[in-house]
Amino acid sequence: SLSAREQSHLSVSSLLLRGKSAEARAAVYEHVKEWPCDVLIAQMCTSVFGLIGFSGLPGREAEQLSFMTNLTPNYGDDWWCKAQLAFAQLEVGQLDEAGINIEEALLSNPNSAHSKHIRAHLYYENLQDEDGLSYLQRHWENYDPSGALYNHISWHVGLWSLETGNLEQMWNVLDKHISPDNSQGPPLNVLTDTAALLFRAELAGVEVTPERWRDLSAYAMTKFANPGLGFADFHAAITHARAGNIEALENIIANAKGPVSDLTKKVARAYLYMQDANWLSASELFTSVVREHARFGGSNAQRDLLDFSLAACLIHQGRKREAKTILAITRPRALQKDIISGLH
């Protein structure tokens, strides 16, 4: 017969596999009360793509930190726990604490791609772009392209290449390591990383051919035909808007589901307005979303797209001072370099 722990394993896993994410999240909490060091179950609620990250709940970043803080006393010097705690800390702005924990995690397991990825986020949040690119590129070049994080780590390299002015390298990384044609990564990463890098490039004033957007729109329709995962849907909305695939975009607006469907519909409509150069209507929708876009899940770095989109809409209206004020409060990194065209 199964032990109580094994029965709980099966129950939690069954809920997750059946798509009952809210129930699975609650079941994880119950499981780790009794067996806190059961990493297979605990990890379901960790990181920005986990059951807390994609819960759609207001305050989910604080909940993520609380979850990891409560687990930590049971793990001692375990590198995995320190890395996950560091990620939760840096996402709420506890950068010094995150730095201590991620360095300790890397000392214990210097070969962890997950820990290196978290260290890259710390470089990003500390505005250390050149140092971050140098650090990550050394490790990325020796990382197996079939690795689970290869696609996303490539995105960080490509993004930093863009932000440090190396466009040739950005396109090389995008085409060979991120885009659907060549990536071995999970579809969620392939779509979101490709869309994000292309749109961030456009926001910075780099020309992106319509063919790139049309190809990615076709990929999004194949892999994410039915709206439901808000983080994927808002990247698909960008893609469909830029590709001129209005039917697919309107499908997201009409049929968005899940815990962030309210935000998804607003963002999708905002990108439709952007495509029509209706900057005022787009900026009004983005303004209503930015204060709670953490509900989408993903990292601060990934959701910069939304803050930068609002700024771009304001700039197009001649409201540059407002754009600068908002970014100074929300994402001051945008003021450091020319990463939004027309801001300076």
Question: Language-model segments: which ranges?
Answer:
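Generic helix N-cap/helix-start motif at coil->alpha-helix transitions
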Residues: L2-S8, C37-A42, Y75-K82, P110-K116, ...
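Hydrophobic alpha-helical hairpins/lids featuring a short glycine-rich hinge
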Residues: H9-F54
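Short coil/turn linking the two alpha-helices of tandem helical-hairpin repeats
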Residues: L17-K20, T46-L57, A86, V92-G93, ...
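Residue at a conserved register position within TPR or TPR-like alpha-solenoid repeats
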Residues: L15, F49-I52, Q89, L122-Y123, ...
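A conserved active-site cap/scaffold subdomain adjacent to cofactor or substrate pockets
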Residues: L149, S154-A220, D233
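C-terminal non-catalytic interaction modules
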Residues: L198, K266, L272-H344
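Internal metal/ion-chelating core segments
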Residues: Q64-T164
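Alpha-helical repeat scaffolds
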Residues: S1, A22-V32, P58-P73, L95-L106, ...
